[in-house]
């Protein structure tokens, strides 16, 4: 059970506590949630960044939460009830190699953090980091609940369980939320019914992270799959943009043409953004992103975004201000509240397969809905993936398992086999080996 005696003495350990993204979202959501309070221990390899978040956090909300930068994992984790992990494995310079070095071989990636050459190399960087985190949780906070936001989600979460089998960990991702919003807008357009919240769209979710699928969807007991079939056929060529979004104006937006195309092929609704979906299978998407109306996200954009967030950090500190007190749209705080006994929640999480996805390997990290209540996360039986999707997902699961094992055992040969087996690596073996070695060399130098 948890260490807490009352809901005003909660301890959250934040690994990656210098984050200017996920950590600030948590601060925002905690600042408007009046159900609980306590301490947030901020641990980061960049201690100065954690100290800055301490200052900003302590100016956020009405003082219910005390933020403290700490210098060691032990200090962060000791007596923690909840552990949050959101780190960048390596640096943006490393990610520049992940995403852009394969372009010399004609391999283009829209994100490069999950699969493809970039996802595999990033995974190899992440494995020893997550192994260390898992051991520290085992030693200092074995009863805590762990929420991981770091990509590659499946590999990172798998390593947590491999190193500490008794861990209570879930991986959380917001990609499904965007598909719920798409379905909500479809209901309004096609049926003339306003959907107040995307959560009101009930979905059966299954697959692996960033390659997740919806096989059932409903609103007020209305079956939405036949309606989506018409919707997809109508917008398959032109695309459909969510209200307030324009795919040309943001590297994170799309017109859902990839999702519509995959639905026409496999008969289930892809529940991730087009940028992620496109990387899981070979085909025309990454060769012609503008035709399919999504973007390849350059690392130059991420570096510019980081610079702007650093400026915002300094501004908040000088002005002695905290984060904006508004909901981030993430579900982390609601998950924490449910785990602490403050209600129940059904949402999508990544956990070892215990049979919740019938036709994917047991113990592989799969994404499905789960029922969350006090000190319990129960995956919901979600059935089987369509056969064609199963074949695609199984290949990536094999690669993810190989990357986790290769990283833990330092088996370069196994790592290369996973690299060569990725669907985006459609080049000669000799070229693939040279690319792999060059990317691996960059890891060793970083």
From Swiss-Prot:
Protein's UniProt keywords contain Repeat: no
Biological-process GO terms, alphabetical: carbohydrate metabolic process
InterPro entries: GH4_Enzyme_sf, GlycHydrolase_4_CS, Glyco_hydro_4, Glyco_hydro_4_C, Lactate_DH/Glyco_Ohase_4_C, NAD(P)-bd_dom_sf
Cofactor(s) of this protein: NAD(+); Mn(2+)
UniProt: Mn(2+) binding residues: 173, 210
GO molecular function: galacturan 1,4-alpha-galacturonidase activity; hydrolase activity, hydrolyzing O-glycosyl compounds; metal ion binding; oxidoreductase activity, acting on the CH-OH group of donors, NAD or NADP as acceptor
Pfam families to which the protein is assigned, alphabetical: Glyco_hydro_4 (PF02056), Glyco_hydro_4C (PF11975)
Extent of the signal sequence: none
Enzyme Commission number: 3.2.1.67
Catalysis: reaction(s): [(1->4)-alpha-D-galacturonosyl](n) + H2O = alpha-D-galacturonate + [(1->4)-alpha-D-galacturonosyl](n-1)
CDD domains, per database record: GH4_alpha_glucosidase_galactosidase (cd05297)
Keywords: Carbohydrate metabolism, Glycosidase, Hydrolase, Manganese, Metal-binding, NAD
Gene Ontology terms: cellular component: cytosol
Active site: 174 (proton donor)
Ligand binding (NAD(+)): 10-72
Subunit-level organization: Homotetramer.
Family: Belongs to the glycosyl hydrolase 4 family.
Role played: Alpha-galacturonidase able to catalyze the hydrolysis of the chromogenic substrate p-nitrophenyl-alpha-D-galacturonic acid (pNPalphaGalUA), and of the probable natural substrate alpha-1,4-di-galacturonate (GalUA(2)). Can neither hydrolyze pNPbetaGalUA, nor the stereoisomeric pNPalphaGlcUA. Does not display alpha- or beta-glucosidase activity as it fails to hydrolyze melibiose, raffinose, lactose and the chromogenic analogs, pNPalphaGal and pNPbetaGal.
Descriptive protein name: Alpha-galacturonidase
Source species: Bacillus subtilis (strain 168)
Source lineage: Bacteria, Bacillati, Bacillota, Bacilli, Bacillales
Gene expressing this chain: lplD
